[in-house]
């Protein structure tokens, strides 16, 4: 039975999972790596840490499964999106640490672009807004701030890529410089309607075309790993950004299906089919996947803080020692208190898009303690998801008929408390699948589809299995009261921004 290996390169760790042809998991390995915070709002990774942990976990997973390179039909890569690496085209040496998707250093540059009236043009081409979150302004910053970088780029000496592209380059020994349409669609440089890099956008941000990778289908032959990495060459046949990979792993192939992934942040995607839907509620229009040259689009809402709110409770406040303690602690909170956490630690994502504001707690009393803080942290994830859910239903013309169930995945879905509260606030069922590793599964599926190991999308969807459905149990009056309180808290926070 052949294996398909998924590389899942995330914000805080790298993982590798071997899937069997029946979609069961044979083995997995995970290794964390450090994040660097050189200034307020700046987040960086060492590219060598990304590479070393990726290779180490691949080898560890292969060892656990007793698999050799000959046993693996294909590799699929999924990655933290928007994070950028720029490297020397000959040596492969990065010119700077990777600038991570959470990084806000280009906020002022983005503000200037908006003030110049450029956002409507950018949004029309990319489906995105002008925000430090996306790759384009990060690349521009590197070219303008690393000594000699712009001149080297103009001479064709530098390559740019998102993390998938960087890993592909390294895996193939520098032979392949490519990415897929999902990752390209997150750069602010890619026209999602034409499916190509856009000259007007490249000129706007000052990015030479010679730096850019080839853009391919999400399921395609990308190249072959050099033999010395895994004791033999393995073909690389699938690439997708992490949220699009999770959408595929959740089998959201039908327009109207929606999934939400809970990791460091929270990301909800609604499949809109072959037609890109323009949002009137500050959602993003993005590429869900591209197969056989045909793009499927999605509406996306991006929240920057979800699981990291629990990390803050643990590492910042010392309220808990383990994430699993958060739900039971929240259960002990005083129901008479209404404490709201707006976790804008790095600004606010959809649907508010304010990079300047910072987090705040509302409704504190003398009796507020650890239980109330845990309660507020978990509920903040649910409230933010509600904001995305409401925006998607407003933008999607067939929402009442289609977007009736939310499929969830990611580490936080292990918390029954959080998932039940999510169903209560959405007033909709929340479905947790049997296979929680949906991001890795999506990458594996794309690779296995190209390799002929996995079936066509609809047959794959037929194999999706439900672990638990959380049904809403909160009264309408309580729901409305809680949502109104959240709305006031968000409004109060936004009012602290002098730019508002």
Curated annotation (Swiss-Prot):
Keywords: ATP-binding, Glycerol metabolism, Kinase, Nucleotide-binding, Transferase. GO terms for cellular component: cytosol. Signal peptide: none annotated. It catalyses: glycerol + ATP = sn-glycerol 3-phosphate + ADP + H(+). It comes from the Bacteria. One of its GO terms (molecular function) is glycerol kinase activity. GO terms for biological process: glycerol catabolic process; glycerol metabolic process; glycerol-3-phosphate metabolic process. It holds the Pfam family FGGY_C. The keyword Electron transport does not apply. Disulfide bonds: none annotated. Its EC number is 2.7.1.30. Glycerol binds at residues 81-82, 133, 242-243. Inhibited by fructose 1,6-bisphosphate (FBP). Sn-glycerol 3-phosphate binds at residues 11, 81-82, 133, 242. ADP binds at residues 11, 15, 264, 307, 411. Pathway: Polyol metabolism; glycerol degradation via glycerol kinase pathway; sn-glycerol 3-phosphate from glycerol: step 1/1. It is an enzyme of class 2 (transferase). ATP binds at residues 11-13, 264, 307, 311, 411. Key enzyme in the regulation of glycerol uptake and metabolism. Catalyzes the phosphorylation of glycerol to yield sn-glycerol 3-phosphate. Belongs to the FGGY kinase family. This is Glycerol kinase. The gene is glpK.
């Amino acid at each position: 039975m052949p294996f398909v290996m998924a590389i899942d390169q995330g914000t805080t760790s790298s993982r590798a999972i071997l899937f069997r042809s029946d979609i069961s998991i044979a083995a997995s390995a995970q290794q964390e790596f450090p994040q660097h915070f050189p200034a307020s709002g700046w987040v960086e990774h060492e590219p060598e840490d990304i590479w070393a942990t990726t290779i180490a976990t691949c080898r560890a997973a292969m060892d656990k499964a007793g698999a050799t390179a000959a046993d693996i039909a294909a590799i699929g890569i999924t990655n933290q999106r928007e994070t950028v690496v720029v490297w020397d085209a000959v040596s492969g040496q990065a010119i700077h640490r990777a600038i991570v998707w959470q990084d806000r250093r280009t906020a002022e540059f983005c503000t200037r672009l908006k003030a110049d009236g450029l956002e409507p043009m950018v949004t029309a081409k990319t489906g995105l807004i002008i925000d430090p979150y996306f790759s384009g302004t990060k690349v521009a910053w590197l070219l303008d701030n690393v000594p000699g970088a712009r001149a080297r780029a103009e001479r064709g000496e530098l390559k740019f890529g998102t993390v998938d592209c960087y890993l592909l380059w390294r895996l193939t020994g520098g032979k392949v410089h490519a990415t897929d349409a999902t990752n390209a669609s997150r750069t602010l440089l890619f026209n999602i309607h034409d499916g190509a890099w856009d000259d007007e956008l490249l000129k706007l941000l000052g990015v030479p075309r010679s730096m850019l990778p080839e853009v391919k289908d999400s399921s395609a032959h990308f190249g072959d790993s050099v033999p010395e990495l895994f004791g033999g060459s393995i073909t690389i046949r699938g690439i997708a950004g992490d949220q699009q990979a999770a959408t595929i792993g959740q089998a959201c192939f039908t327009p109207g299906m929606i999934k939400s992934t809970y990791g460091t942040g929270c990301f909800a995607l609604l499949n809109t089919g072959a037609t890109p839907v323009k949002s009137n509620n500050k959602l993003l229009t993005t590429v869900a996947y591209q197969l056989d040259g045909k793009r499927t689009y999605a509406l996306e809402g991006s929240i920057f803080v979800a699981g990291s709110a629990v990390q803050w409770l643990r590492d910042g406040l010392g309220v808990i020692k383990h994430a699993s303690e958060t739900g039971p602690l929240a259960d002990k909170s005083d129901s008479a208190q209404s404490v709201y956490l707006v976790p804008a630690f790095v600004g606010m994502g959809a649907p508010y898009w304010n990079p300047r504001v910072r987090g705040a707690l509302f409704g504190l009393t003398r009796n507020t303690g650890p239980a109330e803080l845990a309660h507020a942290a978990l509920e903040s994830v649910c409230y933010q998801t509600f904001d995305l859910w409401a925006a998607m239903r407003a933008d999607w013309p067939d929402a009442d008929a289609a977007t009736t169930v939310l499929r969830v995945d990611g580490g936080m879905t292990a918390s029954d408390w959080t998932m039940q509260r999510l169903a209560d606030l959405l007033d909709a069922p929340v479905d947790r699948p049997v296979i929680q590793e949906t991001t890795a599964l999506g990458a594996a599926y794309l690779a296995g589809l190209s390799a002929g190991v996995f079936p066509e999308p609809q047959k794959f969807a037929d194999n999706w299995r439900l672990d638990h459905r959380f049904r809403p149990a909160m009264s309408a009056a309580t729901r409305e009261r809680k949502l109104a309180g959240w709305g006031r808290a968000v409004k109060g926070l936004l009012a602290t921004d002098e730019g508002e």
